Structure formats: C-alpha cells, structure tokens
Amino acid sequence: MGIKVYKPTTNGRRNMTSLDFAEITTSTPEKSLLVALKSKAGRNNNGRITVRHQGGGHKRFYRLVDFKRNKDGVEAIVKTIEYDPNRSANIALVHYTDGVKAYIIAPKGLEVGQRIVSGPEADIKVGNALPLANIPVGTVVHNIELKPGRGGELVRAAGASAQVLGQEGKYVLVRLQSGEVRMILGTCRATVGTVGNEQHGLVNLGKAGRSRWKGIRPTVRGSVMNPNDHPHGGGEGKAPVGRKAPSTPWGKPALGLKTRNKKAKSDKLIVRRRNQK
C-alpha cells in the first residue's frame, strides 16, 4: 500500500499524507462478523477518566477477527481485503470450504482468491497457521500465541514480524519486533508472513481534526498547567520542571523508570532483553 501526498491547498493539507488503500477490495464489511462497539471515551464504570486523551471520533463497528486459527485441515479462500478502523493492520475475509466465514489479519502478499489453511501439516506459505515447532528456522511469522489455544497475542500490528531462531526442547526461540528473544511453547501457533499495511507508520495526519476523527484528544504538557493540575505546573513564564526528575500528573517518576514487575514469572522465558547490546 502506497503513501498519498497532498498538495498544500490549505494549511491543514500542507504536509498531510494518507494511505492510497490500493490493496482494499471492498468498503462493505461482512455483516455477520460485526459487533456494536460503545464508545467509552477513556472512562471506567464510575464515569472517571482512567485513560486520558480518548473520546469523540467516528462511530465504529468491531470486526470479530479470528486470532486462534484452529480450523485444522479446512481450506479457506480469501474473498476480500478490508480496512479495519479498530487496528493498524488490514483484515482479510476468508470463506472456509465448510461454509464458515471469518476475518483474519491480512499478511503482506496475501491476495484475493488465494487458498490458506491451518494445522500441523500446513505448508510454509504466507497466511497459513501452524504450531511453532513445525515452522522451519528463519521463517518470518506473526500473530503468535503465548498459551496454546488462547489465540495470537504477539506481533499483530501493521508491518510487524518476528523470526523463528531455533528450538530448545519443548520451546521455540523467537526474535520479536523489539529485538527481544523469547522462548515460546512449540505447541503455540503462529501465522507465516509479515503483517501487511507496512506503510501505516509513515502517515502524517496533517491537522488536529484528523486526530479527533480517530478519537484521539489533545495531549497537554504539564509545564503549561497550574500547580494543582500537574507537578510541573506553575511558575512565572516558561519555568523548568522544578523537580529532580520529571513526573507523571500523579507525582510518580516518569521518562525512563522501569515499570515491569521484577518478579514476573515470564522472566525465565526471555533469553535476550530488547535493549541488550
């Protein structure tokens, strides 16, 4: 999918870019796979803001995407490649030979009319899903499970990919997009290929209104707030932070503080950390 560059006919159009949606084959989703999605605007059940900078935006329907890929041995034909407003990747509508319809994350190179299948005996072909233990070393994969049968949880964003590095007993070594090398059970499934729509991160929204269409509200710097709103607030004019280190609106250390649980049980499965040289 290419990038479309606009002429600076207005201030909002200057530097604006968008995807050309050349891969999208239909604008009408499969009705049986849609679910109503109520906007929460970052609020919890008490109506309090628990996630800032969310609210507004265009109304969406949630597309039921099959992350499990557990219909073994049943072939499916790719019918459409569609836009999904709920994720950065595109999705593909597939029709199984037994009549079932499903959405999957559309990998790079997947085309309408292509046949895909899942299961331990599946070929190493883009769009096919199989256990990690059955995938050769060096293969690029996405939509990786962390627990067998729970569905893919890792490597689902546009342009993301991971690589199978080897096998150690019942575990398979996988290098993730971040550079982290992790051991994952060989019975966990993954889909062959890279997630499509890899140009997604290069889009320049161009104007504030386009962020609002996506349901993203403005992010205000703490230094321009009042002291009762943020620890960085107050002072005369453009005042510095005034503290030993930057902090969150709730006074906790920000920018660089490690937030991972030091007793996380999954530590033993991480062979190489993402920031390790």
Swiss-Prot record:
This is Large ribosomal subunit protein uL2. GO terms for cellular component: large ribosomal subunit. The gene is rplB. PROSITE patterns: RIBOSOMAL_L2. Keywords: Ribonucleoprotein, Ribosomal protein, RNA-binding, rRNA-binding. PANTHER family: LARGE RIBOSOMAL SUBUNIT PROTEIN UL2M, RIBOSOMAL PROTEIN L2. Part of the 50S ribosomal subunit. Forms a bridge to the 30S subunit in the 70S ribosome. Belongs to the universal ribosomal protein uL2 family. GO terms for molecular function: rRNA binding; structural constituent of ribosome; transferase activity. GO terms for biological process: cytoplasmic translation. One of the primary rRNA binding proteins. Required for association of the 30S and 50S subunits to form the 70S ribosome, for tRNA binding and peptide bond formation. It has been suggested to have peptidyltransferase activity; this is somewhat controversial. Makes several contacts with the 16S rRNA in the 70S ribosome. Residues 219-277 are annotated as: Disordered. HAMAP family: Ribosomal_uL2_B.
